[in-house]
Structures are given as structure tokens and as C-alpha cells.
Amino acid sequence: MLSTAPAQAAQHQDANEYAIWNFHGATGFWNIDQRVQITQKANHSYWAMMWDFTATPGNGGYMGLQTDGTRFNHTTGDTAIFSLWNANAGRGSCGPFGGEGTGLSCRLAYAIDRQTDYRLRVWRLNADTGGQWWGAWIRNMKTGVDTAIGSLRVPRNQTLLGVPSNFSEYFGTAVACDKVPQSVAYFTQPAANAQGNGTYRYGSTYERSTRGRCTGGNVRLVDLGRTKAAKVTLGGR
């Protein structure tokens, strides 16, 4: 029997660009902060900071901003996201995810302004009998408003973060590799373990980049004056 249901378009694969940072041997952080500014948006795109837990290499989480993101209240649009693999509880607008492992994700509507930079923050919270809690916030650096994305609990041994990296990804409908919609994001040098007054125990420098096999793009280190940033261009030829 032939189905009369419309065929679902395939999702694009391998359209990503990664920026890798060097903390010069330091690892095991209870906090990581980083700013991002998305100066050119594209549909169905994700700009994120990601990390592993030192106790479980290859297993960690990510946070960032998406266009056309799907939220747990069944709405879509610009979205702030915080996700941890193997999370067992959440506080906020959170729910399960799958496809690339399993865990929990917190998602909320959050408008992306191309003229504004945002501080991404992940921070270790309290522990309880069920495990270790982590929280994520996004701050609009123009208004100074901090917004909590949510809190997630992971197994008790996941108490420290490894060195972070960044990625820009297109996750929309499959297109030709040279037709991936172009986006541009600036990720500043991430820093760890905030000491107050804008200072940190650990800083980083840009190391290298990698790109998926089905997209154009590049990463360039640029000097912003107060800091440097990885300018991540994804898509195009």
C-alpha cells in the first residue's frame, strides 16, 4: 500500500565548523564563560560552546543559540539551549533529547540580535543524593540582563569541566554542499573559574579549526581590542 502522507525532507548532515581552544594544560573547571556575537544569521543554525566532563571524556554537554529551534512547549524560533548527556533531572523548561546520545535539554525563546554580543555561562551548582547540578545562563551584554536557561543534574562524578570548544552548525533540510546558508559568529576566547570583577583563574588562546565535509566556511582569528575572537563563517562556497 502506498502512503498518502507527505514525505519528510531529509536533514542536512556534516555542515559544521569547529573552533578549538588551548588552555595550556589547565583543565578541571567549575565555571566557563564566553561571549558570542552572531552578525549574520541563517535559518536552522546553531552556535554553541561545548565541553566534556573530566571524569567522562567524550561525554559532556553544550549551550548556545539556535534559529528555528524547537522548544518543549511546541513553539519554534530563536532559542537558547543548554544540554547535558546522561542528565537525570532538570529545572526549567527541560526535557529529554536523543539522536546523538541521550540526556536532557533546557530550551527557551530568546531573540538573537545581530548587533549584540551575549555571554554564555555554565556554572557548577549544588550536589544532592541524585547527582551534581549544573546551571547555564545567557547575558545580553547590551542590557546587562542575565537569563537562566535552566539547571540539569548529572551523575555525582561529573563535577569538573574539560576544555571547551565551539561549533557552528546547519541542521536544516538537506541541500547541496555549496548551498548551505551562510552565517557568521564571533566567539571570544573562553575563560574559566570566574574570580570577580571580570577576572578569571584560567584563560585560553585559539589553536585550530575543523570543518565538516558538506559545507563551505572558515575560521579566522580576529583582534577585537579587549580580546581576540574566532570568526566562524559557515556555509557558502
Model segments located where?
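Short beta-strand segments enriched in hydrophobic/aromatic residues
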Residues: V36-Q40, R124-N126, N140, Y170
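Lectin-type carbohydrate-recognition ectodomains
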Residues: F72-T75, T79, A87-A89, P96-G98, ...
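Short, aromatic/His-centered strand-loop micro-motif at the edge of beta-sheets
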Residues: G95-R119
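Residues embedded in well-ordered secondary-structure elements
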Residues: F23, A109-A111, L125
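Secretory/extracellular carbohydrate-interaction modules
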Residues: A10-C94, R107, N193-R237
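Localized edge beta-strand/strand-to-loop motifs within extracellular or lumenal beta-rich domains
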Residues: D113-W134
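Aromatic sugar-binding interfaces of carbohydrate-active proteins
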Residues: G130-V219, L224-T227
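Secretory targeting and sorting signals
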Residues: M1-A9
